[in-house]
Amino acid sequence: MIEPTSVKAPRILVIRGGAIGDFILTLPVLAALRERFPGVEIEVLGYPRIASLALSGGLAKAVHAIESPGLAMFFARGGSFDLEWREFFGQFAIVISYLFDPDKIFETNVKSCGPCQFIAAQHRPDEAKPIHASDVFLKPLEQLTIFDGDPVARLELPGLGKRKNWLALHPGSGSESKNWPEQNWRELVAHLLDHSPLNLLLIGGEAEGDRLQRLANGMLSDRLEIAQHIPLPELAPRLAKCAGYVGHDTGMTHLAAALGLPTLVLWGPSNETVWRPLGEKVRVLNQHSELAKLTLETVVEGINALELEQF
């Protein structure tokens, strides 16, 4: 479905699929466009459950669903395009696409609809090069004379009060190789409840399965809450009120860092130079693909070093 927007102001469309982390790492693009073109309406074509974060943070005027059936023919040669989508693409002064489109089929089809300028951006960094993902995603904006975009993803949500005395923990990921062992997490939860005044918010989605319930089993229920399967637009403000965050190499960790939380990342086998969350309050514990060897003591020291805001 195409969301209605103003037809008066010039419009820029940023097309971004991918998972939560991919989108968060593209927020600097939206911020740079907004700063460079303050009178332009910036819109996103992506997955609304993720891209709606840009609406909440004031980085986009509208979000349109990339999974719309009417878009399917734009990925085929010689397709018969939906009239509504032809008119939609033709209304933009600039279209910036981060889709994987090696044969330029999508690019060719969108160009035929009449946007003034189409910029084909790299959909994923080359991990053989020591360049952070956000810098890779900002690079195409040089075609718009934007050379100084801030690579730090920042998401400011309006109307939030002081941060509560809560520490958010995300003990899972989409890959077991990225996870600190579950038993270690259980020991960490017990330690924090016994030796700190912090309340704990365990967050997760489908990837965590029953892990959160297992970690909470037998713990002090009045100081521990589980937030699982909560839509991002609802989870983000709840997360933003926490004093800090501990998690793995995940999209949720990128979200916490973008929200400005003191963030401790238990890093696994991924390329840290390319994929780590950026920010003044981010600390990374990297065991160089041997995450299981990361000790409880080291993690507790890392949490203490975050200088959490407590009330």
Enumerate the predicted regions with their spans.
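Catalytic machinery of carbohydrate-active enzymes
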Residues: M1-F311
